[in-house]
């Protein structure tokens, strides 16, 4: 029974739960690695000593947080749980493929961990650029294992994307138009399209790298007429849509949370929100070379990528101001989920502003590969994606489990985390502006002060993570059951109660026009 339920599951709720648990577990591993990084950088001089090991830790931290924490939780966990409930579908379109998507991830994770434990590990950075990732600078099987890991994670995501697109287009009730689906459903569908279009390009790039390393091809080797810059184009054609894949489901969740705790029945500017997400998805594919301003692109190429990148700020701004307009005049409830959403809006906006700075190719020449870039993408990931995940988690926790979190502790957890991440990443802007480069395990004494502050911040975040584990335990131990949910008419995922029965919407739902 246990094996049938959890290993061979075809139920979207169970698979969503598996994704959430797997993502939480991977998140702990990724957090541990990030604390190793900050411990090394907490003072001048060496702690680990070996730069190769340091870079293996940095690389693994990135891969784990992206492919095994944010994506499984946002798309696999929240997506699986909520999308069928929100559109009134009995399950996903392909329930067994759904199960396969999940079970490809643990082997993928295992391969990634294996890549660090054999030979010297893959100390390439998450971008895996040749020639550093070639078979000379990285002899041994480490990089090959990392490539296979990416292949499995990529197949998992592509299958999941097919499943979500089919489900959302095909499994709505007959009367429901695409423009009546909730914004979270839209965000997952757009994310799925991005995955479907970008991951095959990554697969091509890393497969060419694999043959370069093992079969003596020269796709990325000038000695045989290849070009390492080709790899960068292939990687970033995936890599840039990927960062929007990481944040778009978060946008959807934030829209729901802000609407709910403002006491509104709908978000401000629904169609504008949909348009903005579609625009972001489209533009995300035509800006990839802004990651390559320092590789010698033509001046008019740089001009195009600078301006195209800045255009993305427009739909993003539409979303931010629509969230603020949703808040406006609302009956605001200061719940923990609302705090996460407000923190998201504020900090994501700051991350967006530093993104506008980096979009300028002339400025980026100076800031590329400094801690300014690290600060920028951690503001949008560590405080955008993660805050959205936390907000979604505390908002939908009663739906998933039937129990309620302790309100006061959940708020305390938010404030500890808020202080921790800001203390960790705000000083990194200063380090970057004064020229501290990324991916080095040591630095000149001049950079000591802000690195100390940053490392202290990381340990404050650690206490927040530990407190979160306790808060979840406390909720299960106290068993405070959900009495009633407000606004269920406009939030149909709550209609079946908390937690909903194993099978929901077995008869089609009828929607009043």
Swiss-Prot record:
Mitochondrial matrix side: 1-11, 87-94, 171-182, 262-269, 328-335, 401-406, 479-513
Catalytic activity: 4 Fe(II)-[cytochrome c] + O2 + 8 H(+)(in) = 4 Fe(III)-[cytochrome c] + 2 H2O + 4 H(+)(out)
Keyword line: Calcium, Copper, Electron transport, Heme, Iron, Magnesium, Membrane, Metal-binding, Mitochondrion, Mitochondrion inner membrane, Respiratory chain, Sodium, Translocase, Transmembrane, Transmembrane helix, Transport
Gene3D superfamilies: Cytochrome c oxidase-like, subunit I domain
EC number: 7.1.1.9
Binding site for O2: 244
Main location: mitochondrion
Annotated function: Component of the cytochrome c oxidase, the last enzyme in the mitochondrial electron transport chain which drives oxidative phosphorylation. The respiratory chain contains 3 multisubunit complexes succinate dehydrogenase (complex II, CII), ubiquinol-cytochrome c oxidoreductase (cytochrome b-c1 complex, complex III, CIII) and cytochrome c oxidase (complex IV, CIV), that cooperate to transfer electrons derived from NADH and succinate to molecular oxygen, creating an electrochemical gradient over the inner membrane that drives transmembrane transport and the ATP synthase.
Protein name per the record: Cytochrome c oxidase subunit 1
Source lineage: Eukaryota, Metazoa, Chordata, Craniata, Vertebrata
């Amino acid at each position: 029974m246990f094996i049938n339920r959890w290993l061979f599951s075809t139920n979207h709720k169970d698979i969503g739960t598996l994704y959430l648990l797997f993502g939480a577990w991977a998140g702990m591993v990724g957090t541990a690695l990030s604390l190793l990084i900050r411990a090394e950088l907490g003072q001048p001089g060496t702690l680990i000593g070996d730069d190769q090991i340091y870079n293996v830790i940095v690389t693994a931290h990135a891969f784990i947080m992206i492919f095994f924490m944010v994506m499984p939780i946002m798309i696999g966990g929240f997506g699986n749980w909520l999308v069928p409930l929100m559109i009134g579908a009995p399950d996903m379109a392909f329930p067994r493929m759904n199960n396969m998507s999940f079970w490809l991830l643990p082997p993928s994770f295992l391969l990634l961990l294996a890549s660090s434990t054999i030979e010297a590990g893959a100390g390439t950075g998450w971008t895996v650029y040749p020639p550093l990732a070639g078979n000379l600078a990285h002899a041994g099987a480490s990089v090959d294992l990392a490539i296979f890991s990416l292949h499995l994670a990529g197949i998992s995501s592509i299958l999941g994307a097919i499943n979500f697109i089919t489900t959302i287009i095909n499994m709505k009730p007959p009367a429901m138009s695409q423009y009546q689906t909730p914004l979270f459903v839209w965000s997952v569908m757009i994310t799925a399209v991005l995955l479907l279009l970008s991951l095959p390009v990554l697969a091509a790039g890393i497969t060419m790298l694999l043959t370069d390393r093992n079969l003596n091809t020269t796709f990325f080797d000038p000695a045989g007429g290849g070009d390492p810059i080709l790899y960068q184009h292939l990687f970033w054609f995936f890599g840039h849509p990927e960062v929007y894949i990481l944040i778009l489901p978060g946008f959807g969740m934030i829209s729901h949370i802000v609407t709910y705790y403002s006491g509104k029945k709908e978000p401000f500017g629904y169609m504008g929100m949909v348009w903005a997400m579609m625009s972001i998805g489209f533009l995300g594919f035509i800006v990839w070379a802004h990651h390559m301003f320092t590789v010698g692109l033509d001046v008019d190429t740089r001009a195009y990528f600078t301006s195209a990148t800045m255009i993305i700020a427009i739909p993003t701004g539409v979303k931010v101001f629509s969230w603020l307009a949703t808040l406006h005049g609302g009956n605001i409830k200061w719940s923990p989920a609302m705090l996460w959403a407000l923190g998201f809006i504020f900090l994501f906006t700051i991350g967006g502003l530093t993104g506008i700075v980096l979009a300028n190719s002339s400025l980026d020449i100076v800031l590329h590969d400094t801690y300014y870039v690290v600060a920028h993408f951690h503001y949008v990931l560590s405080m955008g994606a993660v805050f959205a995940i936390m907000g979604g988690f505390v908002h939908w926790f009663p739906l998933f489990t039937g129990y309620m979190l302790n309100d006061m502790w959940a708020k305390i957890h938010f404030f500890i985390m808020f202080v921790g991440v800001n203390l960790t990443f705000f000083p990194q802007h200063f380090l970057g502006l004064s020229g501290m480069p990324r991916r080095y395990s040591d630095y000149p004494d001049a950079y000591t002060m802000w690195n100390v502050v940053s490392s202290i911040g990381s340990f404050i975040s650690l206490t927040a993570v530990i407190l979160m584990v306790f808060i979840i335990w406390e909720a299960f131990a106290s068993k405070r059951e959900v009495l009633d949910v407000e606004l269920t008419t406009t939030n149909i995922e709550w209609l079946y109660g908390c937690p909903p029965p194993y099978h929901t919407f077995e008869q089609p739902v009828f929607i009043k026009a």
